[in-house]
């Protein structure tokens, strides 16, 4: 027979013990006193009410309290608590850039700074300087830029690059490259060379290659991209770039597309305790490879969505559907038109851009990834690519609901009301980078006309339809946070979302502006949701990771054009002050 439990009034001794144990457990986890308190500030929590508090307390890398100065200091302050008077400054949740390319950015200026390359003359000067220091016969690579950002507003051809007779030259425009005459010669590319599948060798009016290769870089001989950097240099460059992101106010970033080698670099940085901030990796595969190879690799990969921890984990699986709008390979719903042919060096009046695989192949690859538990994503810049991605998602949705995977379109630069409605029905999010609008809007307006850009990065239309937006930069080249390709300063991105101002000072479709609060959510709680992390980051609430950024002016009330000038004065990551400029 079990012994009866002694009672004191209505409370059992066992119950009292359980309560005591629970209290002790909380004390062990949180401790009696906070490690850090920020007070006398404007703490923008980005909670469900978008409340603004005066103070926040941190213990063991977690937020433990928010509220008034008096309440937080009285309940959380102890003899060992560091107390910081914000003197009225604003604190935001740690900012999240959902899509950038840290390794590429880190390597771009690892050995020497890059000059501005905004004209043919600047490109030619760069080639001449490199020719003086590069052994004859070795490739000279002109760092990435786009014809939409050149004063000439025209893709260079081989003649523009023919300023050195002794070196093959490559002009890097991402999915399109241009090579000089010597580069064509040593690669054996002639008027009779067939274009590769899903690629094209562009030709002049005489039928000779003009140097422009669209998704045809595989034809080049002797080019060794990245081979000049050792693994240690790559690790150092990656670490350096991630640290620059942290200093800009970012506490989490989304790697925009890493292959197997690049994934190992992240894992090594983490193992060596050199990871400066939180990283969510998008695993990218080259959809141009044979289908059997792709599905075999997907099924045997040792990771899937959400594997990892708060510092390094896997996000989505990614393939590229099309190329870029800045180089004329984004797959559009309509042909590019006369100015597009001039800008991009096109000759076919019916050219709509490029798809990198067949619809059947995309479906098969995504089906294999979904079976492994991946969230699905795709680089889609043109409207035609957006539509094909949604058709693929609808086919998968008929097999099993796709919404729980939190799949998303990356860029989705050219939208339509119909496509946005389909995204809402499927639960597809939009991974957007406002920098493209700012940097390339004026050139693209010449290609498509003002009305043709009505749904170009349509943030307001997304929100009105109930589509989740995650904000980012698509940074890829350069160290300067405000002048890089693309600028990774998060406040630059927020400013564009709020104003829709281009680099010419024009406003592109003001009806698509969002509020400051909405813009901030794209870099905080909505970006966290896209990463399956809204329960641990993206807002300043008790129990969440203590990631915050203190800024030098009031984001919510400063003049609009001051948003882009905001500077972080303190960054807190995992409860520790890691950047301090106050």
Task: Put a short name on every predicted segment.
Residues 289-292, 440-444, 581-582:
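Short, charged, surface-exposed secondary-structure boundary motifs
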Residues 33-39, 48-299, 306, 311-315, ...:
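Divalent metal-binding segments
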Residues 367-377, 384-407, 411, 417-421, ...:
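His/Asp/Glu-enriched, well-ordered alpha-helical/loop segment
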């Amino acid at each position: 027979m079990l012994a009866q439990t002694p009672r004191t009034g209505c409370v059992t001794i066992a119950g009292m013990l359980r309560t005591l144990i629970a209290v002790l457990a909380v004390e062990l986890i949180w401790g009696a006193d906070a490690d850090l308190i920020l007070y006398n500030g404007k703490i923008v929590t980005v909670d469900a009410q978008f409340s603004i508090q005066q103070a926040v307390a941190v213990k063991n890398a977690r937020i433990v309290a928010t509220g008034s100065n008096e309440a937080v200091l009285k309940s959380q302050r102890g003899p060992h608590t560091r107390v910081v008077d914000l003197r009225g400054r604003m604190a935001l949740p740690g900012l999240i850039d959902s899509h950038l390319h840290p390794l590429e950015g880190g390597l771009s200026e690892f050995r020497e700074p890059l000059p501005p390359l905004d004209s043919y003359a600047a490109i030619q000067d760069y080639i001449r300087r490199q020719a003086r220091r590069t052994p004859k016969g070795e490739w000279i690579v002109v760092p990435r830029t786009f014809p939409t950002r050149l004063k000439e507003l025209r893709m260079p051809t081989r003649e523009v690059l023919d300023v050195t007779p002794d070196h093959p030259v490559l002009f890097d425009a991402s999915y399109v490259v241009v090579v000089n005459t010597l580069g064509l010669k040593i690669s054996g590319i002639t008027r009779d060379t067939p274009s590769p599948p899903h690629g094209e060798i562009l030709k002049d009016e005489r039928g000779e290659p003009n140097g422009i290769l669209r998704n045809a870089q595989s034809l080049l001989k002797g080019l060794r991209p990245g081979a000049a950097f050792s693994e240690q240099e790559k690790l150092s460059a990656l670490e350096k770039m991630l640290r620059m992101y942290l200093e800009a106010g970012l506490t989490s970033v989304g790697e925009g597309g890493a292959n197997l080698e690049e994934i190992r670099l992240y894992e090594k940085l983490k193992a060596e305790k050199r990871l400066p901030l939180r990283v969510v990796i998008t695993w990218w595969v080259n959809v141009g490879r044979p289908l059997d190879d792709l599905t075999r690799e997907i099924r045997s990969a040792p990771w899937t969505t959400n594997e990892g921890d708060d510092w390094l984990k896997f996000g989505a699986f990614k393939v590229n559907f099309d190329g870029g709008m800045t180089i004329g390979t984004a797959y559009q719903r309509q042909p590019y038109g006369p100015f597009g042919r001039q800008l991009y060096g096109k000759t076919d009046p019916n050219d709509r851009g490029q798809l990198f695989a067949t619809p059947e192949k995309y479906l098969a690859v995504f089906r294999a990834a979904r079976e492994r538990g991946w969230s699905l994503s795709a680089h889609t810049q043109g409207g035609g690519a957006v539509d094909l991605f949604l058709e693929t998602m609808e086919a998968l949705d008929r097999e099993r609901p796709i919404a729980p995977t939190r799949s998303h379109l990356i860029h989705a630069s050219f939208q339509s009301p119909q496509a946005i409605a389909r995204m809402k029905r499927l639960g597809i999010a939009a991974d957007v980078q406002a920098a493209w609008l700012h940097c390339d809007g004026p050139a693209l307006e010449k290609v498509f006309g003002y009305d043709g850009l009505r749904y170009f990065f349509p943030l307001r239309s997304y929100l009105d339809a109930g589509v989740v937006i995650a904000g980012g930069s698509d940074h890829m080249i350069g160290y300067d946070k405000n002048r890089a390709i693309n600028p990774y300063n998060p406040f630059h991105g927020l400013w564009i979302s709020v104003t829709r101002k281009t680099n010419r000072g024009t406003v592109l479709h003001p009806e698509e502006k969002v509020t400051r609060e909405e813009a901030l959510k794209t870099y905080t709680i909505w970006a966290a949701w896209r990463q399956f992390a809204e329960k641990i980051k993206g807002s300043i609430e008790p129990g969440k990771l203590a990631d915050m950024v203190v800024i030098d002016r009031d984001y919510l009330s400063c003049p609009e054009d001051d948003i882009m000038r905001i500077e972080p004065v303190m960054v807190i990551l995992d409860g520790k002050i890691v950047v301090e400029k106050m």
